[in-house]
C-alpha cells in the first residue's frame, strides 16, 4: 500500500513495463528520479560561454539536471531523469560528436526514452532536444540559435515558448539571459506542483585543461519558496565577489586606483558586507595608504568584532605590514579604543 507521503511514486508505477532488465544489463528499479522541471541550455555567441539553468519542484535539482564542461557543451537531463545523459553526453561531445548526434545515440540506447526529456548544446552552439512521448503533460521543448528550452509537468503548453522568447529578447550576459528565461517560465505558470529548487552552471567556451579555472559560475538553491528569486540574489552576490576578485588582481598588479574602484563597486552592491570592507582596508594598508584604510577598518570592526581580533594574526601571513606602529594605529580604530 502506498502511504500518503509516498504518493509521488504513483506516476512511476505506470512505467513498470519499461523496467524489464535485458540480459547483461544491471537493474534500474525506476526509470529515474521524478525531476519534472523546466530548464535552458545556451551559449553566449559573444564570449563562447556555455551554460544551463533549471528550476524544479524537487529538492536539490542542481546535482541532477544541469551539466557543463568548458570547451565541450552543456546538458539538461530531466523528467524521469537519467543522470547518465549528463556525463555521457559531455563525453561524446568532448570526442567531437556534435550535440544532435550525441543526443541521438544516447536516446537510441535508452529503453526508457519515452519518459526522458534531454537537451544538449555543444561548444559550436549546435543544439538538440528530446521530449519523450510519455513525459507528463504539459511537456515540450523549443530550440533556437544557440539555445534550447524544455519543460514537463507544466501548468500548460505556454511555458517553454515564453522561456524561448525571453531568452531571445533579454539583454546582458549569459547568466542574466538564462535567469530571464526561467523567470518567464515561472510567470507563464511553471510547474503544476509549485517550486522548490533551482541551479545555474556556466563554463568558459574554451577549456584550459584546468576545470577549476574554467567554471565561471555554479550556484544552487536547494530548498526555497521562491528558488528563482533566490538564485538571482546569489548571481548578484557572485557579481559582487567578482568585483572583489578584480580588486585583488589589481592590487597584485600595483594598480591601486583600479583596486579601489572594484572594491568600492563591491561594497556598493552589498552594503553592510563587512568581509568586503575589511579586505579593502587591508589591501590599502599593505600598499601604504593607511589613512584611507583606517575608516574602513573602523567600519569593519563595528560590524563584526572578529575582524579586530584577526588583525594581529595577519602580518605573519603577509596580509598586513609587520610593523607594530601600523598595527597599533589599525587597532586604535577598533572597539577597545572606543
Predicted feature residues:
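Short coil turns that delineate tetratricopeptide repeat
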Residues: 271, 305-306
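TPR alpha-solenoid repeat register
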Residues: 276, 310-311
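Canonical tetratricopeptide repeat
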Residues: 279, 313-314
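Bacterial N-terminal signal peptides
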Residues: 10-20
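Alpha/propeptide regions of enzymes that mature by internal proteolysis
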Residues: 26-193, 200, 222-255, 268
Amino acid at each position: 500500500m502506498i502511504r500518503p507521503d509516498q504518493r509521488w511514486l504513483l506516476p512511476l508505477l505506470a512505467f513498470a513495463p519499461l523496467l524489464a532488465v535485458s540480459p547483461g544489463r544491471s537493474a534500474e528499479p525506476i526509470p529515474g528520479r521524478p525531476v519534472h522541471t523546466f530548464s535552458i541550455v545556451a551559449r553566449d555567441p559573444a564570449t563562447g560561454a556555455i551554460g544551463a539553468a533549471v528550476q524544479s519542484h524537487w529538492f536539490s535539482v542542481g546535482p541532477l539536471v544541469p551539466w557543463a564542461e568548458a570547451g565541450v557543451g552543456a546538458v539538461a537531463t530531466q523528467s524521469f531523469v537519467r543522470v547518465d545523459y549528463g556525463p555521457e553526453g559531455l563525453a561524446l561531445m568532448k570526442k567531437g560528436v556534435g550535440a544532435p548526434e550525441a543526443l541521438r545515440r544516447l536516446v537510441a540506447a535508452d529503453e526508457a526514452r519515452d519518459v526522458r526529456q534531454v537537451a544538449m548544446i555543444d561548444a559550436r552552439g549546435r543544439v538538440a532536444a528530446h521530449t519523450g512521448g510519455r513525459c507528463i503533460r504539459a511537456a515540450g521543448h523549443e530550440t533556437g540559435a544557440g539555445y534550447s528550452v524544455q519543460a514537463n509537468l507544466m501548468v500548460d503548453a505556454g511555458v517553454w515558448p515564453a522561456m524561448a522568447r525571453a531568452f531571445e529578447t533579454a539583454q546582458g550576459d549569459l547568466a542574466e539571459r538564462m535567469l530571464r528565461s526561467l523567470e518567464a517560465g515561472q510567470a507563464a505558470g511553471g510547474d503544476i506542483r509549485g517550486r522548490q529548487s533551482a541551479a545555474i552552471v556556466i563554463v568558459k567556451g574554451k577549456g584550459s585543461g584546468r576545470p577549476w579555472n574554467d567554471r565561471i559560475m555554479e550556484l544552487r538553491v536547494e530548498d526555497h519558496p521562491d528558488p528563482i528569486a533566490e538564485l538571482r540574489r546569489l548571481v548578484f552576490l557572485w557579481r559582487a565577489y567578482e568585483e572583489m576578485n578584480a580588486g585583488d588582481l589589481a592590487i597584485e598588479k600595483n594598480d591601486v586606483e583600479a583596486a579601489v574602484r572594484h572594491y568600492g563597486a563591491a561594497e556598493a552592491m552589498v552594503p553592510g558586507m563587512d568581509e568586503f570592507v575589511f579586505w579593502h582596508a587591508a589591501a590599502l594598508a599593505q600598499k601604504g595608504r593607511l589613512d584611507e584604510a583606517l575608516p574602513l577598518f573602523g567600519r569593519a570592526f563595528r560590524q563584526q568584532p572578529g575582524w579586530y581580533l584577526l588583525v594581529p594574526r595577519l602580518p605573519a601571513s603577509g596580509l598586513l605590514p609587520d610593523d607594530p606602529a601600523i598595527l597599533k594605529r589599525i587597532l586604535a580604530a577598533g572597539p577597545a579604543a572606543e
